[in-house]
């Protein structure tokens, strides 16, 4: 039974996504369906967590819009996410960046990772 579930899961996995981690700034292109129309909406922010594995893997992106913090959680392997663009790589020491919720302004800024 487990082998059957693994084969169904592996068929649903996407391979066209970039390797991103918490701390990275990403631009997520999301398909939004309004009535009978659909359009692509961009959500740009910092990845504050990546959780789960396989088909059930999700990631949460946080941005500040009009001085209000907005967090949105996306499944990694969903067809609703058109594409994920990696804007910058962040240099952080934690896997879950929940402490960014309390920080404001310059304190909430993440150092950019230097490629060497």
UniProtKB/Swiss-Prot annotation:
Sections of the chain in a coiled coil: none
A Pfam family that the UniProt record links to this protein: Ribosomal_L19
Keyword annotations of the record: Ribonucleoprotein, Ribosomal protein
Q: Which SUPFAM superfamilies match?
A: Translation proteins SH3-like domain (SSF50104)
Please name the InterPro entries in this protein's record. Answer: Ribosomal_bL19, Ribosomal_bL19_CS, Ribosomal_bL19_sf, Translation_prot_SH3-like_sf
Write one Gene Ontology MF term.
structural constituent of ribosome
| GO CC annotation, single | cytosolic large ribosomal subunit
Give the superkingdom in one word: Bacteria
* Function, as annotated: This protein is located at the 30S-50S ribosomal subunit interface and may play a role in the structure and function of the aminoacyl-tRNA binding site.
Name the family. Answer: Belongs to the bacterial ribosomal protein bL19 family.
Q: By what name is this protein known?
A: Large ribosomal subunit protein bL19
